[in-house]
Structure formats: C-alpha cells, structure tokens
Amino acid sequence: MKDQIKNTTYLVYDCACGSGGMLTEAEIFLLELATGMGKKVVIHLFGQEVNPETYAICQADMLIKVKETDNIKYASTLANDGFPDFTFDFMLANPPYGKSWKVDQDKILVGRKKEVKDNRFLVKHQGEELQLIPRSSDGQLLFLVNKLSKMKDSTKLGSRIAIVHNGSALFTGDAGSGESNIRRWIIENDWLECIVGLPLNMFYNTGIATYIWIISNKKSVERRGKVQLIDGREWYGKLRKSLGSKSCELRGEDIDRRTEEFLDFSESDNSRIFDNEDFGFHKIVVERPLHFSFQVTAARVQEFGEKMGDDLLGVVDILRGLFGEEVQWDFNLVKRDFEKALKVEGWNLKKRDLDLIYQIFTEKDERGEAVILKQTKKGVVYQADAELRDTENVPLKENIEEYFEREVLPHVSDAWIDFDKVVRGYEISFTKYFYKFQKLRSLEDIVEELLELEKETEGILREIVFE
C-alpha cells in the first residue's frame, strides 16, 4: 500500500470514534509512512460519536491539536449519518458489539413489514435486493456496512477499511439473514482481504475473542478472489497489572509478526489462503412426502358431527358406503373415489369443508402411500410433510444434485429438494481452520496417575471417619 501513497490529500474516517484516539494514531501512522516514502500529504480526520462525554473529549482533543472540529459529529451513526455524501480513503473503527440497536430502528426500518428506508442498508446485488439488516440485539455489522457505503472508487488506492469485530460477526446468522447477506455482499464483491485473530482480553470492557477485518475495494492482483486468515491469537505480551478485562497487549514484535504474515501472503501454520467461494454455501430445503391412512370410526364420525353439523351427515353415509370401516392405506384413491361420488350424489362442498373432512378421517402413518399434491408434465409432485422437513448446507464448490445423491438419498430415498427455497449464505469458521489436534493421553498413563492418587490419599478416609 505504501508504494501507492501520493502527494495528495487523504480523508480518514471513524464512525464510532469515541475520544478520537484511533483517528489520531491513524494520522500519525500515515504521516510517518508518507514521510518515509518522500511524500507530502494532507490528512483530514472525520468521526462520529453518540456518547456525549467521549464526544466532548474528542472535540477538546481536536481543538488542542488544531484540527477541524466540524468534522466530528455528535449523533448515532446508524440513525443519523453525519457524512452522507462523503467517501473516504481510509476508514477504521472498533464499534460496539453485542449491543442492541433497537433505539435506532425507526430511522432505518419503516412500517409493519419493517421495510428498509436507509439506502446504506439495502443494496442491489447480482439481480437480487439484499437487506443488510442484522438481528436487533447486535448492530456491530451495521457500522461496517456504513463504511462500505463510503468507499472511494475514483482513485488507484481506492478505500481501505480496518474494523474490529467479535467472533459472532464471522458466522452468526443463517443463509438469507442480514448477517449472512452482509458477508455475502462483501465476499462476492471481492472486498475482503484478510481477517486477523487477536488475543483474548485485549480490551478494557470484554475478554471475548476479537478479529480485525481488513477490507479493500482495490485489491492487489495476487489477492483477487482470495481471502487470507491470520491466527495471531497467541502473539501478545502480558500486562503486569490488568486494566479491567484487559490483561494483554500487542508488543512491537507481535505487530511485526502479523504484518509479515500479511505481506508474505502465503500458507503457514498461522496463515491460510482461501478462495472467496470456500466460505459460501447453498442452504437447501430437503422435503419428504406426507403419508396418510384413512378410516371411518365412531369417534371420528362424532367429531365430524360436532365440527360440520348434522346437515352434512349424509357425507358420512357416502364414506361408509365406499370404504366401510376398514383402514385405507392409499389416501390418493380415497380422495379420488370420494370426490367422484360427491358429484354423482349432487353434493357441492367448498374446499375448506373437504379439507376438514380429510383432516378428521385421516392420520399421519408411514405405512400409507405418499400423498400426491398434483400431476405435472415432469411427473408426480408429492405433498411435503412439514414435520420431516430438513435443511442441508452444500458448499458452493459442490454441485447440489451430486451432494444430495451422495449425502441425503442413501438415508432417505423418498426425499427431494425444493429448489424454490435454495438460499446462498456465507460464514467464516475461523477457529476450525486453525484447529490443532490434542493427542489424547494413553490409558496406561491415566491408570498410573489414578494409582498414584490412590496412594496419596491412603488413610485420609480413615482419619475423616474415625477422628
């Protein structure tokens, strides 16, 4: 990136800037980088903060450093975008994660159907309209989407984003959900360069796992179509005294190791390179047919009278005449013969009445024939049993039909795929890719340890009981 720094003006933006510390550090870093390359740059800092106290501190800090205080806005970034017409060269943030954004919903969603009215969070993508709205309990990815809406296309460098998220941003949300749509939009646009795992206990107010997402809309040639994962969870130094939840820090050598892995862009124990498609999958809905048995019984006739009334008891006589009180295992034949007889006898029942009759005199039974929904030119379409419905996640690189034949049909031979419900999703199982197998202890070692413990505790029980 440093080779692309020019003698020009750069805009730096933090949409959750707090007291402005990250903005200030970003400016220092960029100035040092430019100076080292013999370039003269002008840097303008932009930020937005919702907390009044930290906003005031940020404003004061900007005044002391003779910066443009008008570029620091006080409001919720999600509800009131302070820079709707701006694009930025560099963007960074450590947004709140695991925090509800319900207070901002009315500014983003409208109506009973919660339609998106803020264009930052509704995009056209590959012929689809994607809603980039995560669950209301966690709005961290909305801050990322806000930044993506402000990327600059007009320069060779484009825009570069570095943002910290917790682990849930990597995988939370099923295919078609707001979270998955956001990941899909980013990865299919080939913006995601790298995700770097950080140590636990890095921040004052939480000890959970966190990750840096590095995003660019102008990737270098060798990175196009690729995503790099760097496992830096064990590269840190311990603080002598904890500060809240923060008990570790990144030393210079820890930062250098991460930087070297990123620049090297190759496979190692702590670096993995993937194709964009490796994180995608098709969620398919697997259906199985409904099976009914049919029988006219005294209990069901009584239920019929209670629900349908005495005026329709003549229908029961038709059923008895056709099927007696024997169990019928092919509901399709029952339905055909019964409805034919109704026409002959002059009965004109509404569909809802027919459906209720079938509901009363049938029950689900695997011994019965599969219920036919309709006949088409392509063949028979069976009625699906909602209770047997299942889903499978098929990797994008796999053919759906081949996967289905290999993984599903050997176990449920009557299943089929509802192709109208196929949805594409994305998730990044970071820890899975860096899992290190821990060899189990041998049985001999465990037995030996138990025997040693038994020797150490010999006589203790006797002392407890008899003293």
List where the protein language model places each region.
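Conserved S-adenosyl-L-methionine
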Residues: 1-93, 97-113, 166-168, 174-182, ...
